[in-house]
């Protein structure tokens, strides 16, 4: 079974499960999201790990805790946060009904979207699922 609970948290985001939940996601966060595995919040170690990931991603999720977002201004940052949260909510609802998605956005759909919206998407995220 290929479901959220049988994969590691990092794999969920590397595979861009969030992108597949809402069409606007690859346009709003084309680099994907970074994930910090569970760590004690509030300490230096988690701050350093988060800062490292924020160099690459505009969104970093703390496993079992929360999310950090960065943008050019408040409105863009709030919109980013809202888009990620909405996509995660859709994903959770889908996976609560079935472990396998019955339909999804294909890699070629993502490539077309990227072309039309003039964004670059990492090819490593664009592959056919087995």
What do the PLM-derived regions correspond to, one by one?
Residues 2-9, 13:
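Single conserved hydrophobic/aromatic residue that forms the stacking wall/gate
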Residues 11, 17, 58-59:
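Conserved active-site beta-strand-loop modules that form the wall/rim of enzyme catalytic pockets
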